[in-house]
């Protein structure tokens, strides 16, 4: 019983002994803001620019995006290898033509192939 009375007394003292906000704090803050305003005005600082609030933070936290299916692997086409053969022959014929034209102009075929490889690396 004595312990309960003692604890209630200590709790009461702790509540009433807590520091309170000083009186007139808002008035002091307003006076300091006016003083700052007058100092900025004397120094030539653009006060109107200071009064405008900074740009609002556009990051509003995590916003889920629409689900994209780009992560899914591409399905292999069921194209028959026979249909690719004419395309490969046409490409080989064009390459042979370019190499022959290069030889007629005095360019080494290895240089032409190296140039084509270099161009294809950056694409």
Curated annotation (Swiss-Prot):
Propeptide positions: 30-31, 66-67, 75-76
- The record lists the organism as Caenorhabditis elegans
Q: What happens when the gene is disrupted?
A: Defecation defects including a distended intestinal lumen, a strong defect in intestinal content expulsion and reduced anterior body wall contraction.
The yes or no answer to whether the keyword Cytoplasm is present is no
Q: Which GO terms describe its molecular function?
A: neuropeptide receptor binding
**Signal peptide (UniProt feature, chain positions):** 1-17
What this protein is called in its record is Neuropeptide-like peptides nlp-40
- Where is it made, tissue-wise? Expressed in intestinal cells.
Q: Which GO terms of type biological process are on file? A: neuropeptide signaling pathway; positive regulation of defecation
Q: What's the domain of life for this entry? A: Eukaryota
User: What keywords are annotated for this sequence in UniProt?
Assistant: Cleavage on pair of basic residues, Cytoplasmic vesicle, Neuropeptide, Secreted, Signal
Record localization: Secreted; Cytoplasmic vesicle
What's in the GO CC field?
cytoplasmic vesicle; extracellular space
